[in-house]
Swiss-Prot record:
It catalyses: ATP + H2O + a folded polypeptide = ADP + phosphate + an unfolded polypeptide. It is found in: Cytoplasm. It comes from the Bacteria. GO terms for molecular function: ATP binding; ATP-dependent protein folding chaperone; isomerase activity; unfolded protein binding. It comes from Azoarcus sp. (strain BH72). NCBIfam families: GroEL, PRK00013.1, PRK12849.1, PRK12850.1, PRK12851.1. This is Chaperonin GroEL 1. ATP binds at residues 30-33, 51, 87-91, 415, 479-481, 495. SUPFAM superfamilies: GroEL apical domain-like (SSF52029), GroEL equatorial domain-like (SSF48592), GroEL-intermediate domain like (SSF54849). It holds the Pfam family Cpn60_TCP1. The keyword Cytoplasm applies. Its EC number is 5.6.1.7.
């Protein structure tokens, strides 16, 4: 095992704080509407220009291993806040830096780090309660647009398009972000449930202009295995033909004789059908078939539940108002499923989301919720260059997360005002001893830091602005974008409560860990001996020469 370098006490903490400061100073310049850009080097191609705190944090790796440990811990604050709330990464970094910086002074003065931690925790719990009291629901389109704009670095277009998307597909609907083809942002909305499987044969197309198969008022047959033999299908096909309605077959696969017969019947106009493969793979395929069954009011024909194709009746089939099948996608519009069953299914998937351990699983489960809950909106981000596109896309994704957070837990006045108002209510908070009181003071001091940074980045005098905002009350604050004082809510400067809460919790959590650190262990760099000159090869063809004189 390689030898380790061990640092104790103040020397360990000093190196760690140095790393914290490097990362936090790089990230905090992006805070606020007048935040500065950070240029990130790329190994090939143009550098990336960003105002996104977490993107900057992820790029930073320090040469000194002990400083790097400090930087990585603050990076964790930023990425954790981004994962939970989708925004607030820069605020969280600024808060963490302030708590660490102030806390280290008290530790150096000989105070008990554990009592400081208890004081910090006490102040955070009390602040979160105050934030809940300040919070109000975010329900109107205007408020959603304002939250989106603030999170996208004061870009009103992005806020507006997100509000439109949420209006179209509902608060629970899926909103995805893609690269656009033009210079402007565009919004595409797909009503109903969409999955990424298309027709199994182009002969099913009945709308040549759009190159799609459109089935009006069809039955939907869901089968969890492969269909090759037409004999298995005949009983169902006869019943559907009598009813005089089209049929969509969704199965693991349809091939051979079965597919050929369906195509021939379709071409001759005897029975309007279309066949598609079931979406997903393995267990996810079964779950998605079940989702489609609940959405269309049908049943998955599976041996596990005692159903076979030969015995299937019209009652086992799902129904929908309209289904469009393209080359790569199928859209089920207005399925006939009961609302109560769909709701119950959504709740069940939500429980699975909370229990999911991997991001991939969580993302797929969220997609399923959205498909069931209604509609899919696609925001196509437009830009002139690829560099601008990447930066803009990251901002749209941030804004989208922030608006979801706002809908979930409500909104508070933005621009660092909410934390200052919460701080004013905590003036009488006391700890069990003098050291805990110091811990509470650390948090109260840190809570004015986000506003200080916003003001400093806008080129104004932080102390003057902070004092003026503290003297005010309610939503009174400073709008750094315009340089005006006034009611932050009326000016449209809003923050999601969840973002502010998560930023403070994560910052305090990691900062407390640092304050209670007394030892750091790192790899010791090995001193490798300098390499000698490589041996020189002899001249070819001279092996037999006698050098004797």
């Amino acid at each position: 095992m390689a030898a380790k370098e061990v640092k104790f006490g103040d020397s360990a903490r000093e190196r760690m704080v140095a790393g914290v400061n490097v990362l936090a100073n790089a990230v905090k310049v992006t805070l606020g509407p007048k935040g500065r850009n950070v240029v990130l080097e790329r190994s090939f191609g143009a550098p990336t220009v960003t105002k996104d705190g977490v993107s900057v944090a992820k790029e930073i790796e320090l040469k000194d291993k002990f400083e790097n440990m400090g930087a990585q811990m603050v990076k964790e604050v930023a990425s954790k806040t981004s994962d939970i709330a989708g925004d607030g990464t820069t605020t969280a970094t600024v808060l963490a830096q302030s708590i660490v910086r102030e806390g280290m002074k008290f530790v150096a003065a000989g105070m008990n780090p554990m009592d400081l931690k208890r004081g910090i925790d006490k102040a955070v719990v009390a602040t979160i309660e105050e934030l809940k009291k300040l919070s109000k629901p975010c329900s109107t389109n205007k408020e959603i647009a304002q939250v989106g704009s603030i999170s996208a670095n004061s870009d009103a277009d992005i806020g507006g398009i997100i509000a439109q998307a949420m209006e179209k597909v509902g608060k629970e609907g899926v909103i995805t972000v893609e690269d656009g083809k033009s210079l402007n942002n565009e919004l595409d909305v797909v009503e109903g449930m969409q999955f990424d499987r298309g027709y199994l044969s182009p002969y099913f197309i009945n709308n040549p202009d759009k190159q799609v198969a459109i089935l009006e008022n069809p039955f939907v047959l869901l089968f969890d295995k492969k269909i090759s033999n037409i004999r298995d299908l005949l009983p169902v096909l006869e019943q559907v033909a009598k009813a005089g309605r089209p049929l969509l077959i969704i199965a693991e696969d349809v091939d051979g004789e079965a597919l050929a017969t369906l195509v021939v019947n379709n071409i001759r106009g005897i029975l309007k059908t279309c066949a598609v493969k079931a979406p997903g793979f393995g267990d996810r395929r079964k779950a998605m078939l079940e989702d489609i069954a609940i959405l269309t009011g049908g049943q998955v024909i599976a041996e596990e539940v005692g159903l076979t194709l030969e015995k299937a009746t019209l009652q086992d089939l799902g129904q929908a108002k309209r289904i469009e099948i393209g080359k790569e996608n199928t859209i089920i519009i207005d399925g006939a499923g009961e609302a109560s069953r769909i709701e119950a299914r959504v709740k069940q998937i939500r429980v699975q989301i909370e229990e999911a351990t991997s991001d991939y699983d969580r993302e797929k489960l969220q997609e399923r919720v959205a498909k069931l809950a209604g509609g899919v909106a696609v925001i196509k981000v437009g830009a002139a260059t690829e560099v601008e596109m990447k930066e803009k896309k990251a901002r749209v994704e941030d804004a989208l997360h922030a608006t979801r957070a706002a809908v979930e837990e409500g909104i508070v006045p933005g621009g660092g005002v909410a934390l200052l108002r919460a701080r004013a209510s905590l003036a009488g908070l006391k700890g069990d001893n003098h050291d805990q009181d110091a811990g509470i003071k650390i948090v109260l001091r840190a809570m004015e830091q986000p506003l200080r940074e916003i003001v400093a980045n806008a080129g104004d005098e932080a102390s003057v602005v902070v004092n003026k905002v503290v003297e005010g009350s309610g939503n009174f604050g400073y709008n750094a974008a315009t340089g005006e004082y006034g009611d932050m809510v009326e000016m449209g400067v809003l923050d999601p409560t969840k973002v502010t809460r998560t930023a403070l919790q994560n910052a305090a959590s990691v900062a407390s860990l640092m304050l209670t650190t007394d030892c750091m262990v790192g790899e010791l760099a090995e001193d490798k001996p300098a390499g000698g000159m490589p041996g020189m090869g002899g001249m070819g063809g001279m092996g037999g020469m006698d050098m004797g004189m």
